[in-house]
């Protein structure tokens, strides 16, 4: 299948069918307020929609054709608005990088872990990249141990997306993302501790 055909097929798949363009003789009709009206012929459903000065919109074909009475103009506007908000939300999620070395000292490791915690709590995803220098590459287990020690400092608010993997024979990379459930628990416990300290 050519790229043009694939694009056309995708466009047809995403096309919203409404009113006379609906290809089914019968549909399960849902009112604008979500009320289940029941099975109607397309003509009956169209008459009801026109009577309310609304559109008949096909919202599903599996396991049966389902159509809903809607103000299509408003429906289209709301859908575009929602898609835009989702896109903006995805854009706001930053991918940050934290660099480590196999022989990093405890103080430096804790400092970088603290910075990582701040980023995770903001919702950022983190790439932890450990760089081997010279003969250090022969001691891959040392790098794994360092990454494990680093993760121990953030595991109460994070999850590992991708386990440590060697890239370009020099970099041992691990990917982390914020864990919403863990963060909620952490913030709750932190709030309780603050309340105790204020007493």
Swiss-Prot record:
Instruction: Select a single GO molecular function from the record's annotations and give it.
Output: ribosome binding
Q: Which Pfam families match?
A: IF3_C (PF00707), IF3_N (PF05198)
Give yes or no: UniProt keyword DNA damage. no
Localization, UniProt: Cytoplasm
- PROSITE patterns in alphabetical order: IF3
What gene name is listed for this protein? infC
Kindly state which keywords UniProt assigns to this record, in alphabetical order. Cytoplasm, Initiation factor, Protein biosynthesis
Supply the source organism for this entry: Mycoplasmopsis pulmonis (strain UAB CTIP) (Mycoplasma pulmonis)
Question: Which biological process terms from the Gene Ontology are attached to this UniProt entry?
Answer: ribosome disassembly
Q: How does it assemble?
A: Monomer.
Which named protein is this? Translation initiation factor IF-3
Question: Is Ubl conjugation there in the keyword field?
Answer: no
Domain of life the protein comes from: Bacteria
Q: Name one GO cellular component term.
A: cytosol
Function comment: IF-3 binds to the 30S ribosomal subunit and shifts the equilibrium between 70S ribosomes and their 50S and 30S subunits in favor of the free subunits, thus enhancing the availability of 30S subunits on which protein synthesis initiation begins.
């Amino acid at each position: 299948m050519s790229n043009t055909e694939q694009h056309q097929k995708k466009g047809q798949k995403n096309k919203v069918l409404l009113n006379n363009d609906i290809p089914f003789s019968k549909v399960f009709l849902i009112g604008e307020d979500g009320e289940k009206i029941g099975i109607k012929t397309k003509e009956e459903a169209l008459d009801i929609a026109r009577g309310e000065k609304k559109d008949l919109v096909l919202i599903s074909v599996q396991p049966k054709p389902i159509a809903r009475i809607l103000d299509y103009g408003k429906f289209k506007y709301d859908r575009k608005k929602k898609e835009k908000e989702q896109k903006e939300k995805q854009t706001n999620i930053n991918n940050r990088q934290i660099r480590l070395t196999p022989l990093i000292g405890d103080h430096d490791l804790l400092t970088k872990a603290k910075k990582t915690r701040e980023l995770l709590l903001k919702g950022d995803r983190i790439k932890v990249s450990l760089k081997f220098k010279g003969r250090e590459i022969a001691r891959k287990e040392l790098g794994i141990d360092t990454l494990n020690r680093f993760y121990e400092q953030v595991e109460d608010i994070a999850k590992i997306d991708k386990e440590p993997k060697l890239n370009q024979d020099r970099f041992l990379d691990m990917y982390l993302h914020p864990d919403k459930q863990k963060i909620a628990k952490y913030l709750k416990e932190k709030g309780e501790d603050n309340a105790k300290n204020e007493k």
